[in-house]
């Protein structure tokens, strides 16, 4: 039977909601690391609130926000000596319906092969599925980190996440890189549904025009996506290139200038993101 260790990265979590989400999959995990990215001086809860969710939980962190890539890497490093075959990663707002993770594990076992580097799910966000295909499995260019299962052998080979990608596109960059450098494919199972919320965008009227992200988030979103476009132009799909140019840059500038607060910082972050995305080696 597959031995599966989990990692969930938390940042200012709602503890009851986090507990509910973890309880939706903890029975099908052998261990779970909760990596706490919330700065220790800004938490309104105790570490025991996390530990008490389950006896399988191990709480790790350094007291500050390391970003997604580094938090995933340090959590997985912790597990490399454990008796497990695969790792599954979660966002704090992700969950499975009853029995879904057990079914997912069976599919991974049945479809495992040396050529597969990532297994992913069909996630539901805002009442919409990301894939409408009813195939049993699909080979894709990329999948989101949350709900993805990674063979332990990836990390034994040194295929860790890019820590430069503090937030945004950590998942896409990983899938593209292991495909290019190691010939590993990404496979999703359209019938395995993950309940998930994409991003941290403002859900007001303004979001119809452009995602009202902070200056900090805006910088990494633009920088990282321009970088993976340059680095992996054949894998970063045309529709994503259009989305980046139109929504994340052009419409975002319009939105910031006419509707958003903190205009100077956000416009500066857009320019910095473009410059660093184009110049990063």
Describe the predicted segments one by one:
Residues 98-131:
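Conserved donor NDP-sugar-binding/catalytic core segment of glycosyltransferases
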Residues 84-95:
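Short beta-strand-to-loop acidic/aromatic patch adjacent to the donor-nucleotide binding site
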Residues 8-27:
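Short, well-formed alpha-helical segments that are part of the catalytic scaffolds
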Residues 30-41, 60-62:
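Short beta-strand/loop segment that forms part of the nucleotide-sugar
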Residues 132-150, 212:
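A recurrent flexible, glycine/aromatic-enriched loop bordering the glycosyltransferase active site
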Residues 233-281:
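Non-catalytic, C-terminal membrane-associated alpha-helical segments of glycosyltransferases
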Residues 62-79:
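Glycine-rich, basic loop-to-helix element that forms the pyrophosphate-binding segment
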Residues 154, 158-159, 164-198:
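A short, conserved alpha-helix in the catalytic core of glycosyltransferases
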């Amino acid at each position: 039977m597959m031995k599966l260790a989990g990692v969930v990265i938390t940042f200012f979590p709602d503890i009851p909601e986090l507990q509910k989400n973890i309880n939706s999959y903890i029975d099908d995990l052998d261990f779970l690391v909760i990596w706490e990215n919330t700065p220790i001086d800004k938490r309104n809860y105790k570490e025991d609130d996390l530990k008490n969710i389950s006896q399988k939980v191990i709480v790790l962190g350094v007291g500050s926000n390391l970003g997604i890539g580094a938090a995933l890497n340090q959590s997985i490093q912790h597990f490399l000596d454990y008796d497990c075959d695969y790792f599954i990663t979660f966002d704090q707002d992700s969950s499975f319906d009853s029995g879904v993770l057990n079914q997912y594990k069976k599919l991974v076992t049945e479809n495992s092969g040396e050529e597969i580097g990532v297994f992913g799910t069909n996630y539901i966000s805002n009442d919409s599925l990301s894939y409408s295909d009813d195939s049993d499995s699909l080979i894709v260019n990329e999948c989101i980190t949350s709900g993805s299962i990674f063979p332990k052998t990836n990390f034994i080979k040194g295929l860790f996440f890019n820590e430069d990608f503090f937030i945004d596109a950590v998942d896409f960059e990983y899938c593209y890189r292991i495909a290019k450098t190691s010939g590993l494919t990404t496979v999703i199972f359209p019938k395995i549904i993950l309940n998930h919320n994409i991003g941290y965008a403002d859900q007001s009227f303004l979001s119809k025009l452009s995602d009202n992200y902070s200056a900090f988030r805006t910088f990494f979103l633009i920088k990282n996506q321009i970088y993976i476009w340059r680095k992996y132009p054949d894998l970063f799909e045309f529709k994503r290139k259009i989305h980046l140019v139109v929504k994340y840059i052009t419409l975002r500038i319009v939105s910031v200038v006419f509707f958003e607060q903190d205009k100077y910082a956000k416009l500066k972050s857009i320019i910095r993101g473009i410059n660093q995305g184009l110049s990063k080696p």
